[in-house]
Each structure stands twice: as structure tokens, then as C-alpha cells.
Amino acid sequence: MREDRKGIRGRSPTLCVEKKPETMHIRPSILLTNDDGVSSVGLWAAYEALVPIADVTVVAPATQQSAVGRSISIFEPLRANQVVLNGVPAWAVAGKPTDAVIIGLYALKLNPTMVVSGINIGENLSFESIMTSGTVGAALEASNQGVKGIAFSLQVEDQGDKFDDPRTHGQSFDAAKKIVRDVVDRVLAHGFPPDADVINVNIPSKVRGGYEVTRLARKLFHTGVEKRLDPRGRPYFWINGPLFTDAGEGTDVHSVREGNVSITPVTLDCTAHSAHEDIRKIFLS
């Protein structure tokens, strides 16, 4: 059949190019957990900060689990119940922060871009704190399972505030929410540093400076033990002690004391590589 060219005389033929479908933008996904419990105002402050930039699934301990570190429940069964808090479906895990991460990854089959833990009520500064913190412990567990994690903690001015009910804590999270979103946004844009397994972020109660990349101080508290007597005259003990006033420039403790946001890259490799030669002399010579 002859082509009818009427109507195109005097014009160059128009090439018909097949349009390729536009690449779909894949929205990042975040597993959000903590150690203060699924009802904590700090966790929901983090949720509010993150939901505009990612799909967020909350999987957190059902109850307060501060200072449990990376402990894991292996002698009792775990229950995960779906609840609705603040109008949002969430999973409440009757276990530790580490349990919540494992349940999220392996029972709920989540495949998050990253795990975010926090916002913890109270700072998690120094080696001493990150080894006992359930907030940091959850991020460490996530990274050990192949998903990089960021832990967020907000300094309290009175250490006793850490023991208030996290469901009704009066701390302001306005500045912290902006920092949480900005930090996660930056990491999503640039990618997680390959040599860091966890990023530990500590936000001062009153931010006076900017971001500071820091190293871990050794200790946050002067360790002490207080002996008391119960009504029957039998002794019992409280582990307590005042905070270090400082720990030297470059440390996370110093940074937060100065009003800066401390960002500490943490690795799972606890090997003391620089000590290998001395160890060889002791055991292999």
C-alpha cells in the first residue's frame, strides 16, 4: 500500500523514537528500633524525622531495655505483637533491642536500607557506654547481620532524667529531629562509609556548634558502689558514680560538652592489630 504523505509535504520526516520508561526512584527503607521501648517519645520523634525521607518500620522492645547492650534472648521464647501507636502500626517485641533487630530481619523478613536506633533518652558516649547501651547494641547487631546502623542519643542535663517514664518524658526533641533527618539524609546520599559498621551520633541537650567527627573516650562515669540496708538490715548495692567533666579534645565526651554533635564511626573489629607483634613475641618466640 502506498504511503499517504499528504500533510507532511515541505517538512522533514519526524523520527518516531520509542520512549524508555523513566527509572523509578526507589524510596529507602529503615528499620527503626531503640532500647527505651516502643512507646518512648524519643523513638517516635525519630519516626517523625525519618518518615518524610524513607519508608519506616518500627520494631522495638515492648518495655524499657536500657543498658542491656547486645544481650540476646536464647533461653526464652520471643513474642512479637503488632500494635498501633500514634496511629502507626508497629511491632512490640518482648525482648531486647538485639532481639527486635533479629525479629525484624528474619521473622518479619524486612530488607531495610539501614537500621536506625534511637533517639535514646540520655547520651551514649565513650567505650564504656557503647558496650552497655541497648541503643548502640541494636545498631551493632544490625551491622553484624549485614545492615549498617546509626545510633542516635540525646544528652540529658540531669542524669536522673534517664530513669523517668520514656512514654511521657518532657525533653524537647525539636533540634534532635532535625539532626536525625539531616544525618540520615547525608548517609543515604553519600553511602555508608565502607570502613565503618556503625555511626554513633550524640546530640547535646543544647546544640551550640556543628558536627564533629570524634573518637570514643574510654569512660563516661567514675565508677562507684553505694551500699545500703534494706528494712531487714541486709545490705544491697547500687552501682553509680558522677560523670567525667571532660575526656580530652577529639573525644565524643569533649565534643558534646562543648555543645557539638558528636559523630563517631565504630567498627565491629575489636582486634588490637597494633599489638600483634608484641603478642607474637610472647607466644611464638
Across the structure, where does each feature detected by a protein language model lie?
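Short, glycine-/small-residue-rich phosphate/pyrophosphate-handling segment
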Residues: I150-D182
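A cross-family phosphate/adenosyl-ligand binding-site feature
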Residues: H25-I30, V41-A107, N111
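Short, glycine-rich nucleotide/cofactor-binding loops
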Residues: L32-S39, S129-I130
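Internal, conserved structured core segments that host functional sites
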Residues: I103, L110-D161
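C-terminal accessory domains and tails appended to enzymatic cores
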Residues: H25, T168-Q171, H190-S285
